[in-house]
C-alpha cells in the first residue's frame, strides 16, 4: 500500500527537500502541495524558485498548489515545512481534521503531549500520540522532529547515555541552508563567522532533555543531564559541524565511546541509512564537503574522539542539516509510524 502525502510550505527550502525525497519514495505518493495564497492554483513547476540540487521532480511539476486548509488537501499524511508562527496556527487544524501531521516546525516540539522523536533514539515516545488525541479531542495528531543541530547532537549522545553521561557542552558551526532562502546576506557571511543564531541555543539546550527522557505512559520525564550550547553560522552551504565535550559519572575510554557510537543500530525503513553513526579515524574528519552526504545524508559522522580530563571526552560530529536534520527526519518518523501500525 502507498500512502498519499502532502507538503505544507512546499516552496521553501525544506519544502523542496521534502518533495525531492518523496518523489520516488516506495511507500508514499505525493498528491498535494500547499503554499501561500498568492501561489494557490498555480502549477508547482512553473511557480517555484527551485534552489536545491537537480531539477523539480516530474511528479511535482504539474501539481496545482492549494491553500493551507484541510478542506483542500487530499492526503493521508502531511509533512510540515512551515515557519513556526504559521505552523502554530495551521498544524492543529489538520490534526483536528484527522490528518497525520509530521512536522519539522518548532511550534509544538516542547508541548507536553506532542512527541518529539528521532526514530533511533526514542521511538517509544510515540506513545504520547494517544495522550495527545485524548487531551485535544483530535482525530489526527502531530508528531515533531527536533531542530537540525539537536538531531545531529542527540544521535551522538544516545549511545553515551548508558555510559553514565551527565554534562554536554557543544559549539555548533551551522551551514547557511539552515537559515533558509534567501537566508543570510552574502556580505554578512563572506569572510566571516556569525556567533549568534536567534533562538537556536535554547532549542539545542532544551530539546535533548525531552528526547533522551523516559515516557511513563502519561508524559515525558526529562533526562537528568545538562546541556550548554553556543551556536555559530559559518560560510558552508550544507552540513552542520559540532564540537562536543561530554562528562560522565565515571571514567570512559575512547575505545568504549567508539564501540558505543558504532552500536547504534539502523532501522529497517526506506530512508534509514545502513549505518547511523560513522566513526572516522582520520585526524581531520569529519568535514562538511566530504561527509555530509554519508548514508544519502541520513548518517552522522563522528571523529576526533579524545580524552578530556579524568571523566570527560571530546569529539566532532557532523550531519546534513536539511536531510537528516529536517525533511529526512520527518519522513523517517512517518515511516516508523507505519511500521508500528500507528498509521
From Swiss-Prot:
Its EC number is 1.2.1.11. Disulfide bonds: none annotated. It is an enzyme of class 1 (oxidoreductase). NADP(+) binds at residues 11-14, 177-178, 321-322. Substrate binds at residues 174, 200, 233. One of its GO terms (biological process) is diaminopimelate biosynthetic process. This is Aspartate-semialdehyde dehydrogenase. The gene is asd.
